[in-house]
A protein has these predicted regions:
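Asp-based, Mg2+/Mn2+-dependent phosphohydrolase catalytic module
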Residues: 1-16, 125, 130-215
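Short amphipathic alpha-helical segments and helix-helix/interface helices
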Residues: 105-109, 119, 166, 190
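N-terminal helical cap/lid subdomain that shapes the substrate entry/recognition surface
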Residues: 7-102, 113, 124
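Generic structural signal for small/hydrophobic residues in well-ordered secondary structure
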Residues: 19-22, 63, 111, 119, ...
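Proline-centered loop/turn at the N-terminus of a beta-strand
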Residues: 116-118, 199
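Residues at alpha-helix caps and immediate loop-helix transition turns in enzyme cores, especially N-
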Residues: 28, 32, 103-104, 130-132, ...
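Catalytic-core regions built around general acid/base machinery
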Residues: 103-114, 146
Length: 215
């Protein structure tokens, strides 16, 4: 396995840790904003949803509320959707998730034969139910089985870029932080990982994860 990242020596990497959204799975947030607008939820921006600046989104991603409580919180926050059932709100919330790319799935399978591969994702139960179902329908089997272990923010009750999530994950993996290579599309998450001693790559500028490895 050759890692095509100038600052990383393959010999220095004992395990790979991938982000999900924007790295392994394309996410189009605008689709969810449009779906919410169609339900008469207006004025939401990316920062409120992705950065968790509204409590209902943040708490869902931290696993502090159930998906039913999330739907109820959305109805309380936006009275225009007071009569909208959970299913419609969750469908709009999941609209951002795009289909898995076959090349990226194959890359994960091949990388997993060469070194331990992990997932570290800020996500939530409704999204996880949907992307697992999408993966199973297209590729068969379990998405989570592509990894030695998946670390999900709502199960850890921690979110990137909180430094504690990197400490916790490194402890649970059992590999020195300097031997972990983390790949994420969010600059703050990458910076925080480096601050905890991880090697990290910011996936940006039109580069995809399949461009980073030569098998």
């Amino acid at each position: 396995m050759n890692i095509l990242i100038p600052t990383v020596s393959p010999e220095s990497v004992e395990a790979l840790v991938f982000d999900l959204g924007g790295v392994l799975l394309d996410v189009q947030l605008q689709r969810t904003l449009w779906a919410f607008e169609a339900l008469d939820i207006r004025g939401l921006g990316a920062a409120e949803v992705i950065d968790g600046n509204r409590a209902c989104f943040r708490d869902l991603e931290l696993g502090l509320i159930t998906q039913e409580e999330f739907a109820e919180a959305v109805r309380r926050t936006f009275p225009a959707v007071a009569a909208i059932p959970d299913e419609q709100l969750l469908e709009a919330w999941n609209a951002m998730l795009m289909p898995f790319d076959a090349q990226r799935v194959e890359l994960l399978r091949e990388l997993g034969k060469r070194c331990p591969v992990y997932l570290l994702s800020n996500t939530n139960l409704p999204h996880r139910i949907r992307f697992r179902e999408s993966f199973r329908e297209r590729f068969g089997g379990s998405f989570d089985e592509l990894f030695v272990r998946c670390f999900y923010s709502d199960e850890l009750h921690l979110r990137k870029p909180d430094p504690e999530i990197y400490r916790s994950v490194a402890r649970q993996i059992g590999t020195p932080p300097g031997k972990l290579l983390f790949i994420d599309d969010n600059a703050a998450n990458v910076s925080a990982a480096r601050g905890e001693g991880w090697q990290a790559c910011h996936l940006t500028g039109g580069i995809t994860v399949t461009d980073l490895f030569e098998l």
